[in-house]
Regions:
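Feature captures the catalytic ectodomains and active-site-proximal regions of enzymes
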Residues: 1-392
Length: 392
């Protein structure tokens, strides 16, 4: 029997503050809680999977007979960003946070970047990605400058107008930054943020974003699966997050709708291993922008995909749905990620329905369970498999 796992990360779909959330400035946050009662939220299929039956979830209506197994996962890494969250999902806990720069990057680093790119740098302080275009976009165009800014996450972001700085050139500048940012300056991601428009009111980000990540500190689930001869298909920004390590095929997407379509298409293909999908719009378009209505609508769009996907699952298929952190769209103290538990929903023809796995202390639960199912030794990874609890 061909065994396939479809692991879908709803980027930032947290389900309530973790016990240490206050230390991250995120006490009381709850991404699911923020959207569940909005008129745009209609997720009967996630309900059937057991979303509202999960430990600690107090919104929504519990399903009387969930068709899948479900758990709440607590992050063990010291961070709440995309890179660390995905590494932990893949079985690698990060005991130390990646460096952040709340006061901007050191002048010496910025000067070196200016010299190597031949462009002046503007901003160099934490900023909202949309607001930074309004405040610096026109100046950047007049002065042929690059907009560089950190955030609460471990990132070095470079924005430029595509009409003045071609996308391939912006990517090259980001590669220069990635080479520079090591050791104490080793941010999790260097992100190219191309935009278009001519005035502060018309600037908008394009879909040509590109992330250059640190390589994971050791082998992840992806490497182990690839080394064992399994397919590891990366959909969306998964390839970038792992810097390509352990990936056998990458599929670039332009957002949730596109990512969902590619995932549905993969269902009809023959492969043995893992399809690892990231749906970024939850985080990028709605979480950070604190758009409750948009976030709720995106959840509803995904729910419709679940309804379409499940009937087409083969005998050896398992669908897993999770998240990498929170980004509560109703939380107004910041526009950053939020330190939250994440859901773990599991279903398939061979998966027991209605198994409540409680709260598990590591996102690496996912990596261990996937490797266990695919027959790959994961003794070097963090977390514990729940396969024996969920298989029929």
């Amino acid at each position: 029997m061909e065994k396939r796992v479809f692991l879908i990360v709803l980027d930032s779909f947290g389900i309530g503050a973790e016990p240490d959330a206050a230390a991250f400035g995120d006490e009381g946050t709850n991404t699911l809680g923020a959207i569940a009662n909005h008129p745009n939220f209609n997720c009967p299929n996630l309900k059937k999977l057991g979303l509202f039956n999960i430990d600690g979830v107090t919104v929504g209506e519990k399903d009387a007979a969930p068709i899948g197994s479900f758990a709440r996962l607590q992050e063990q890494s010291m961070g709440k960003d995309t890179t660390i969250g995905h590494w932990e999902i893949a079985g690698v806990v990060s005991p130390k946070p990646l460096p952040t720069f709340p006061d901007g990057f050191p002048d010496s680093l910025i000067h070196e970047f200016e010299e190597k790119t031949g462009h002046k740098v503007l901003c160099n302080k934490p900023y909202s990605g949309t607001q930074v275009l309004k405040d610096y976009g026109e100046q950047a165009m007049k002065e042929d400058a690059l907009i560089v800014y950190p955030s609460a996450d471990s990132v070095f972001q470079v924005a430029a107008n595509e009409e003045l700085v071609p996308v391939h050139e912006l990517y090259r500048y980001c590669e220069i930054a990635r080479e520079m940012l090591k050791g104490e300056y080793g941010v999790g991601r260097v992100i190219a943020r191309p935009f278009l428009g001519h005035t502060a009111d018309t600037f908008y980000r394009t879909t040509n974003r590109h992330d250059l990540s640190l390589k994971p500190p050791r082998k992840t689930m992806l490497d182990l699966l690839k080394d064992a001869g399994k397919d590891v298909i990366a959909v969306g920004k998964i390839f970038d997050i792992f810097d390509g390590e352990g990936v056998t095929e990458k599929i670039k997407t332009t957002g949730n709708t596109n990512g969902i379509a590619f995932t549905k298409a993969l269902q009809t293909r023959d492969f043995e291993g893992l399809a690892f999908v990231n749906l970024v719009d939850f985080d990028m378009l709605y979480g950070h922008r604190r758009d409750v209505a948009g976030y709720a609508a995106a959840a509803t769009e995904f729910d419709k995909f679940v309804a379409d996907f499940i009937p087409g699952m083969r005998e050896g298929d398992i669908l897993m749905v999770t998240a990498d952190h929170g980004c509560d769209p109703s939380y107004t103290k910041t526009t950053d990620h939020t330190r939250e538990y994440v859901p773990y929903l599991i279903c398939g023809k061979g998966v027991k329905p209605g198994v409540d796995l409680g709260t598990r202390l590591c996102f690496g639960t996912i990596a261990q369970t996937i490797c266990d199912y695919l027959g790959v030794d994961a003794s070097t990874l963090d977390g514990q498999s729940v396969l024996s609890d969920i298989l029929k």
